[in-house]
Amino acid sequence: MAIQKAKFSIGDFVKHKHFEFRGVIYDVDFEFNNSEEWYQSIPKNVRPRKDQPFYHLLAENDEITYEAYVSEQNLLMDDSDEPIKHPLIEEIFSGKKGSSYFKPSN
């Protein structure tokens, strides 16, 4: 299998193409790396391909914050510059610039 190149980077603000939520990327899997049970729980008509990057997000919608695992094909860049209001942001990132967060330099 060819190595996949990720379209998005850690710290980028993204939004889902089909569902009303947005988030910040905190990790990337260059191909699907979750359980088969999780994958099969996605309705077949919207189930993404496994051979693409999948992103771990600190996500939010109008009601709650949560963590999400989303395929690249279902994400768009979110250039709103509005901060993500997730309680784990400060544990992972050290600052914000435009529509992305950055990690502390060690």
Predicted features along the sequence, with ranges:
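Short, solvent-exposed secondary-structure boundary/capping segments
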Residues: 32-41
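Residue-level signal for short segments within beta-strands and strand-turn junctions
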Residues: 27-29, 59
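Charge-rich, low-complexity amphipathic helices
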Residues: 1, 36, 45-47, 79
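Intrinsically disordered, low-complexity boundary segments flanking structured domains
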Residues: 12, 41-46
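Intrinsically disordered, low-complexity, charged/polar segments
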Residues: 47-106
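Short amphipathic alpha-helical leader/targeting segments
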Residues: 25-26, 37
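Generic detector of isolated residues embedded in canonical secondary-structure elements
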Residues: 22-24, 56
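Mixed-charge, Lys/Arg-rich low-complexity intrinsically disordered regions
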Residues: 1-13, 18-22, 29-32, 103-106
